[in-house]
Curated annotation (Swiss-Prot):
It comes from Glaesserella parasuis serovar 5 (strain SH0165). The active site is at 25 (proton donor), 159 (nucleophile). Mn(2+) binds at residue 138. GO terms for biological process: nucleobase catabolic process. One of its GO terms (cellular component) is cytoplasm. Substrate binds at residues 86, 106, 140-142. Belongs to the pseudouridine-5'-phosphate glycosidase family. Its EC number is 4.2.1.70. One of its GO terms (molecular function) is metal ion binding. HAMAP family: PsiMP_glycosidase. The keyword Oxidoreductase does not apply. Pfam families: Indigoidine_A (PF04227). This is Pseudouridine-5'-phosphate glycosidase.
Amino acid sequence: MNNYLILSDEVQRGMAQGLPIVALESTIISHGMPYPQNVAMAREVEQIIRDNGAVPATIAIIDGKIRIGLSDDELELFGSSKGIAKVSRRDLPQIIASKKLGATTVASTMICAHLAGIKFFVTGGLGGVHKGWETTLDISADLDELAQTSVTVICAGAKSILDLDATLEYLETKGVPVVGYKTKNLPAFFTRDSGLPLALSCEELTEIAEMIKVKWQLGLEGGVVVANPIPQEDELAPSYINGIIDTAVKEAEEKGIIGKDITPFLLGKIVEMTEGKSLEANIKLVKNNAKVGARLAVEFFK
C-alpha cells in the first residue's frame, strides 16, 4: 500500500470483509455546495452507499496524506472551512508535500481511488470541455484521467455549464466508454436529456458490470463513465435552467474568471439565480448516483 495513503477503519474493515468500496470526492463538499447543506449531503450520500451494500470512502488530502474515508469531524472541516485547495492531478504532489488541506476533484479522486484499489466512484457531474474552448483551451483534467485511470465514474452526465457536444467528442477520441443507464442520450446534470445520443446504453446494471470487467480483462486501461440521469421528478425544466446557465457563463466571461475558479463560480451563481432550486436538484442527483453506483459495485464483485 502506498505510503501516502491512510484508510479509515470503516474502509479497512470493508476491504477485509471483501465488500465493494465506493469512492466519493471532496470538492463537491468544499467547492460545490454551500455549508451546511454540503455536509448533510455528504453524510446522507455515504449512508445511501451503506444501505445499498457497499462501503463509502470520501477522499481528501489532510496533513500530507491521502485520506481514504473521512470521519464525521473531517467531513465537517471540509464543509465549513474557507480556502481549501481544489486539487486535480497537477496539484496533488504540491498539496501533499506542503501538508495543506486539499479537496479532490474527479481526476484526483480517481487517482487516489486507483492507488487504494477502489474501482467505483460516485460524483455529481463530470468536468469537461468549457464553453469557448476554441479560444481558451479550457478542458478539465477529468477527461484525460478517464482515458488513463481504471476507475468507473457514476455521474449525471457532465455539468451542464459545459460544452457537452465537445465533451462527448473528446471522450470518444480518448476511447472512454460513456454508458447511458436507462437512457439513450447523455444526461445534462440538472436535466435528464441533453439531446446528444450515446453510442452505448444499458437497461440493467448486470450488463454494465460485465462490460467493465471485459474492458479491464482485455488490458484496456482507463475509466468508464456511467451516465445516470437525474430522477424525473427532480429535474429542472431545460428552458428554465439553460437560460440561467447562459447568463452565468456570460458574467464569468465579463469578470475574467478562468481555470479552476470557473466551476465553483458558475455553480454558486446558478444557486443564487435559481433561489436554491439548482442546489436541491444537485443534492437529489448525487443521492441517485450513490444508489446506482453502490448497486453497480455490488454487481461487479458478485
